[in-house]
Amino acid sequence: MDENRNEVGGGQLIAGYLGIILMLIGGIILLPIMLLAVYPEESVYASCFTIPGVTAILTGYVMSLFIRGRDKRRLIGHQDALIVVFSWLLAILFCSVPFMLTGKYNFTQSVFECTSGWSTTGLSVVNVEDCPKIFLLFRSVMLFFGGVGLVLVMISVLSDRHGMRLYCAEGHTDRLVPNLVKSARMIIVIYTGYIISGTLLYIYFGMNWFDALNHSIAALSTGGFSTKAESIGYYGSFGIEAVTIVLMLLGSTNFLAHLYLIRGGGKNFFRYCEVKFQLILCALAAPVLSAFLIYGGLEGHVGQGFRDGLFQVVTALTTTGFQTVPSFAVWSSPLIMVMTLLMLIGGGTGSTAGGIKQIRVCIMLKSLCWIIRSKISQKRLIHADGIYRISGYEYLKAEERLEASDFILLYLGVFAAGTFILCACGFGIGDSMFEFASALGTVGLSVGITGYDASPVVLWTETVGMLAGRLEIYVIFVAAVQFGREIKDGYKKTEGR
């Protein structure tokens, strides 16, 4: 009997894990207060962070008591998905409180801004030119932790036997080393190292330290939040744009690929199908976009046209959302179409980027080629085809092809639904497709639909799209079903008493 009492499972186990994550969220909310040492004049905003931060820590501590010092039962069903989704919802809700406490933003706008931050999207309702620095840093802090993932950060601190299930449920696919905790810590070390390097390079090319830090985090997390209304275009610097392109490409590349590259496995890195596919897409799309910009009269100088064309292709494909052009509202339909396609494809698996993911598109295109080849072949051949992963050449199973095609179909279905809602709000089909592709792909580029004055319907549609895109849709559906089961089981237990 004593052993059973010391075991915890079901709702208490879920609540306990959420408590640990909520304490982590509280700590994250308090981080921007450190900036007051440099900008003491913004201490008036300190309470905006201390109130929700301390509340989250205390609430999380109470919830964590459910599992403290007790043996944890195995997670059953899809409780892992439920924990991940609720973790992200708690992060968004608690982080929205500082914005609401300023009195400038309502609940919808605050939740939208924080969903954009945690999902590393970059769409915004904030006027960055009139925003206190402590809130600009807070947005970047959300990008940092949203990029690596809440669960991954928790695992790096705690060693837990359920960690792998939670790690996978959040969308991470690869372990850098056999030990999961070491994998999580290694990802954070690589991630932080790139950010520090990017910050120093930005300072070298003329940014002040505050802008450099924020833009480095935003570029590597493929988040796109900027401290300037004109984004990267404000600086008009080739060096800054080059650093940004490198950081965006690094952020959209699988972290396992980074490890191989750092350890000297350059051969495998450049053979990796996602790296090759990304470089090929950039090489094909950049000249097309540049040509339309130049001949469409949107760029007065050929060199600037190619510069902007390459930058916008990379920012769309990596789902970052920085821009060097004044506005997308004046772009022609072919330009909008190219950008929309790139945003739908997105970045690599196991990276900070969103979208369908390049590996799935690679598998779909390869499958299509194999089908065509088998159709035109005069002999009936059985092909055992595969693709280059970072570890080497691997044959593809039928289940992998089916999973890729199923996800693409589901993704496009959600994309169509979101586009329809924006169209119903009175926007054109092209603009609606662009805007929702940006939200669902966690990109952050906008044709002007999203902003402080956007309607609640638009903001909530994009909020759902951003969260679904960051958690790869399936997890949301699975968590919803599991939540229903938990309520049903709890009701049955209550009836049994």
Mark where each language-model region is.
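Membrane-proximal intracellular helices of multi-pass ion channels
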Residues: 1-497
